[in-house]
Amino acid sequence: LVSDKAYKAGVRSPKDLNGKRYAVTQSGSSFHYMGSKMAAAENIKLSFVPLQKVGAIIGALKSGQVDAWSIVPHIAKPLSRGGSIHIIGNVADYLPNYQITTVFTSSNNANNERALTKNFLTGFSKGVDDYASTMIDKNKGDAGVNEMVDLIHKYVYTSRPREKAAPSIINGTMRLSDGASLNLASIKNQLEWFKSEGLVKKSITIDTLVDQSYVKIIS
């Protein structure tokens, strides 16, 4: 996303962002990682501006205090409808296999509470399968979607009435990894980036970070 100010100044694609102010919540955030990878691919320099909260970033982008930001489509699309913010590219073009979310636990649980951890993953994976079948593949039709929205609304957007929460729940639908599988190449890439930015110790290895014995590993 870019501000209207940047858009009117000629920013039409990510390659036009050289020297621009790119909003992040904080150093090391997914926003920082995505912006950094995009900048490296386009061979440009960005000035990263930490603003802590998403609401603050949206306000700064609308007012032109920052030039660009990246956010999930179900938030980006409504923001782009008002004219003060424009969509100019897709993160997936730069990180096509980006593992943005994982299931994680303490090393004690992974090492010493194996049955508990495996049972959680089994239950979690069943929930993911039900969610994908209903919300993405629509195997139960509109009635199934509505039933799932009712269930999700008990925990998400609870401050909104159901009719106002439903569009956000539906628009935020995404396919999660089957069986909580891990794209190890993506995780390695992220770990190396954290090291290059001085955000984690150089001594940390992929085996420190990932227990590969629990789920399917995608390399």
Question: What feature does the model see in each segment?
Answer:
Residues 1-81, 185:
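Bilobed "Venus flytrap"/periplasmic-binding protein-like clamshell domains
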Residues 21, 26, 39-42, 65, ...:
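Sec/Tat-exported extracytoplasmic proteins
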Residues 1-10, 99-115:
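A bilobed periplasmic-binding-protein/Venus flytrap-type ligand-binding module shared by bacterial periplasmic
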Residues 17, 97-100:
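Short, solvent-exposed loop/turn segments at the edges of secondary structure
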Residues 111-201:
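Secondary-structure end/capping motifs
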Residues 78-92, 163:
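Ligand-binding "clamshell"
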Residues 195-219:
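Long, low-complexity C-terminal extensions of enzymes
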